[in-house]
Amino acid sequence: MKKIIFMGTPSYATCILKALVENENFKLVALFTQPDKAVGRKQILTPSDTKAFLSQNYPSIPIFTPSSLKDKNIIREIKDLNPDFIVVAAYGKILPKAILDLAPCVNLHASLLPKYRGASPIQSAILNKDEKSGVCTMLMEEGLDTGAILESLECDIKDKNSSEVFELLANLAAKIILSTLLNFDKITPKKQEESLATLCRKIKKEDGLINLQNARELYQKYLAFTPWPGVFLENGLKFLELELVDELKQNAKMGEILELEKESFLLACKQGVLRIKKLQESGKKALDGRTYLNGKRLKSEDSLC
């Protein structure tokens, strides 16, 4: 039975953690995750998704929430646990060489590397209109997502939002990690092709700001930034649900309401047309498109904003 230290934080990582802890070939000896965070208006101290899952279902397994992995005491703790593998998935911290040298460190990355190294591979794939994405297992080294690839699985992501793709890739990751660890000695690591490498940065709230220039670009942002940070106009109006109707139409005025439907409306961009199904003004409740227009006394051929 192989001893595993798992390092991960969000729900994506929990799916992988669950697969490992339930498999009879592995013994989870510890979880490392981010410290509890203050959440919401009341700033309630909340554990990470992985910590909540493990403490509720496997309370005897130790959980570590260090602020730094460079602490000598933390490195000693890991060494004393004597793991056969350290598995890392969306942990949120860089592993120092002192830890990388203790055991094979296998990272699960939510892209088909070397594309989209970094913090937002799923959102970046959607923004770039990729129809395929996937998950890789790789041997970790000191560079950012630069290690040799062990295995990969791909899936179709066309017209799926980030939340849906996260779920798809989490399920793939839960499968591939078992395969990689069980067949580790038989796998020949494959170096990444550096000339094909691309980087992606962490998503910020302001990335959700949109204009009505291009319907296709706005739609891809909507998919990429659902559920967070969402998409919103400069005046704070949020588009919560929308569909791409036409990406080429150019003979209407930007921002013009083209047609009212039962619970939605068609909105002209400078190029293309969107169906707005649900929207929300800052500080107010969400409304379907038709109800919102009725409340504002807006009709066909009026400007939304």
Curated annotation (Swiss-Prot):
Its Gene Ontology molecular function terms? methionyl-tRNA formyltransferase activity
Q: Which InterPro entries match?
A: Fmt, Formyl_trans_C, Formyl_transf_N, Formyl_transf_N_sf, Formyl_transferase-like_C_sf, GART_AS, Met-tRNA-FMT_C, Met-tRNA-FMT_N
This chain belongs to the protein called Methionyl-tRNA formyltransferase
Q: Which organism is it from?
A: Campylobacter jejuni subsp. jejuni serotype O:2 (strain ATCC 700819 / NCTC 11168)
Q: Which residues bind (6S)-5,6,7,8-tetrahydrofolate?
A: 111-114
Q: Which reaction does it catalyse?
A: L-methionyl-tRNA(fMet) + (6R)-10-formyltetrahydrofolate = N-formyl-L-methionyl-tRNA(fMet) + (6S)-5,6,7,8-tetrahydrofolate + H(+)
HAMAP family per UniProt:
Formyl_trans (MF_00182)
Q: Which Pfam families match?
A: Formyl_trans_C (PF02911), Formyl_trans_N (PF00551)
Coiled-coil spans in chain: none
Which GO CC annotations does the UniProt entry carry?
cytosol
The UniProt entry's sequence similarity note says:
Belongs to the Fmt family.
Q: Does the keyword Transferase apply?
A: yes
